[in-house]
Amino acid sequence: MEPVRKVEGKALPLGYSDVDTDQIVPSDALKRIERTGFGRFLFAEWREDPDFVLNKPEHQGAVVLIAGENFGCGSSREHAVWAVQDYGFGAVIAPSFADIFKNNCTKNGVLTVELPKETVRRLLEAVREDPEATVTVDLESRTVKGPGVETTFEIDDFVRYRLLNGLDDVGLTLRHEEDIERFERSRPRYMPRVL
């Protein structure tokens, strides 16, 4: 996992509340066995509508997704995060997230930022008015800056540490590689070994 320090660029003003993981990535896409290539399935059913915000040329290349309350609710499929990330989003801003989706984002290097509903509304309106506007999510300073918005956000210290250092669950374990190897060398030969 790559470290996340700052996500800066155009934003996609989705704004919908209660977007579930089936809407983020349809179940048809779950037949894939790789973790890559899910971006093309992001909001697939909604993208059939030519007026859907993600289809608009002015929003191409957005790196920050701005959503409504309870983003990522529904099933626990990690594929939803893979689709968001594979499409190019490094951060998602919303008033609230489903817990499992938020946790999956952390484990995959996508920064989730919870801001008050009114702040998210102002940011959505500003980006809808000026699609070229830059939104900056700075994890080091815990700030979000955009047109008419400059605010701080809270994030768990350990989650912040993981993201800043690019540590997924495997990366956290590998920080103890020497201890693991020492333990394996000290185990009796008749015990199962990890290769």
Swiss-Prot record:
It comes from the Bacteria. GO terms for cellular component: 3-isopropylmalate dehydratase complex. It is an enzyme of class 4 (lyase). One of its GO terms (biological process) is L-leucine biosynthetic process. GO terms for molecular function: 3-isopropylmalate dehydratase activity. It catalyses: (2R,3S)-3-isopropylmalate = (2S)-2-isopropylmalate. The keyword Amino-acid biosynthesis applies. Pathway: Amino-acid biosynthesis; L-leucine biosynthesis; L-leucine from 3-methyl-2-oxobutanoate: step 2/4. The keyword Amino-acid biosynthesis applies. Its EC number is 4.2.1.33. Keywords: Amino-acid biosynthesis, Branched-chain amino acid biosynthesis, Leucine biosynthesis, Lyase. HAMAP family: LeuD_type1. NCBIfam families: leuD, PRK01641.1. Catalyzes the isomerization between 2-isopropylmalate and 3-isopropylmalate, via the formation of 2-isopropylmaleate. Belongs to the LeuD family. LeuD type 1 subfamily. Heterodimer of LeuC and LeuD. This is 3-isopropylmalate dehydratase small subunit. It comes from Rubrobacter xylanophilus (strain DSM 9941 / JCM 11954 / NBRC 16129 / PRD-1).
